[in-house]
Regions:
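HTH-adjacent hinge/linker in prokaryotic transcriptional regulators
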Residues: 2-12, 18-26, 31, 37, ...
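Conserved phosphate- and dinucleotide-binding cores of soluble alpha/beta proteins
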Residues: 5-15, 21-28, 33, 38, ...
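A general structural motif
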Residues: 97, 120-122, 205, 231
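Conserved SAM-binding loop
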Residues: 101, 125, 190
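Hydrophobic/small residue at the entry helix of a nucleotide-binding pocket
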Residues: 107
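Active-site signature of alpha/beta-hydrolase-fold catalytic machinery across serine-
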Residues: 110
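Catalytic core of membrane glycerolipid acyltransferases/transacylases, capturing the structured
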Residues: 114-134
Length: 258
């Protein structure tokens, strides 16, 4: 049989890898009808490109290329200073009398903590995040509404049709959401169900804010739920690279935390 060219072979190997995360030399030889030597060389080439890790007798996908969802507890310890800075910046934009939506995510939990510590503002908060709710529920100046629905323990969020139906009827002065990845003109998250809720909240807000730390730029995740050019503002930390600042400013306003 005529062998496919190298580029095609490498694509095929990556496709096979994406299915279960690991692959053996034998599977490659059987599938692509190539020699042991060629199979090994192909894996070496993909490893050099940073797309996989060679193992004894095969290879495995590098976890950075596979969207891995971390729990909100695990995420809490990541980039904490940056998240606090972002939350402070976002908090400063919330005015007395505002009705706001706060989505799930550790940066938004931080925003809830900032809001709780702030005196003299009466606001209304709607959230589908249990951690956010638990922070704000004993505040005397915040009218609080928790959206119920199907519970996702990994992020502490309520999602699904029940949450969507309730959200559709609501309007906000500002919506604050987070995401796992920002690439080109889109923002993405791991769960389509969470993405849908965030999409609805943004659609129903006069001002739309995305809170992401600078590690989220040029990353990929599973479900694209919004376009950057439909947002009013991205709030990020001051570690954002000049390249990312320039690239993503063509779509929307980027506000750097102090």
């Amino acid at each position: 049989s005529l062998h496919m060219n190298k580029k095609r072979r490498l694509e095929k190997i990556l496709d096979m890898l994406k299915i279960d995360g690991t692959i053996t030399i034998k599977e490659i030889i059987d599938e692509l009808d190539i020699s042991d030597m060629t199979a090994r060389r192909d894996l070496d080439a993909l490893e050099a490109d940073g797309l996989l890790t060679r193992t004894h007798g095969g290879a495995q996908l590098l976890s950075s290329k596979k969207p891995l969802e971390k729990t909100h507890i695990e995420k809490k310890s990541l980039n904490t200073k940056e998240k606090i800075d972002i939350a402070k910046k976002a908090c400063s934009l919330i005015k007395d009398g505002d009705t706001i939506f706060i989505g799930p995510g550790t940066t938004l939990v931080q925003l809830a903590l900032e809001l709780k510590g702030r005196k003299g503002y009466k606001i209304r908060v709607i959230t589908n995040s249990l951690p956010v709710f638990l922070i704000l529920n004993d505040s005397e100046t915040i009218d609080l509404l928790l959206l119920g629905g199907e519970y996702r323990e990994i992020t502490g969020a309520f999602v699904g049709s029940m949450a969507s139906t309730n959200l559709k009827a609501m309007r906000f002065a500002k919506a604050f959401v987070s995401a796992n990845a920002v690439t080109h003109n889109s923002i993405a998250t791991y769960s389509d169900k969470e993405g849908v809720i965030q999409q609805l909240a943004l659609n129903n807000a006069v001002e739309k804010f995305l809170l992401v730390d600078s590690t989220k730029f040029d990353r990929y995740d599973f479900f694209n739920f919004y376009n950057l050019d439909q947002l009013d503002t991205i709030i990020t930390d001051n570690q954002i690279s000049p390249q990312h600042l320039e690239e993503f400013s063509q779509y929307t306003t980027i506000l750097k935390a102090d």
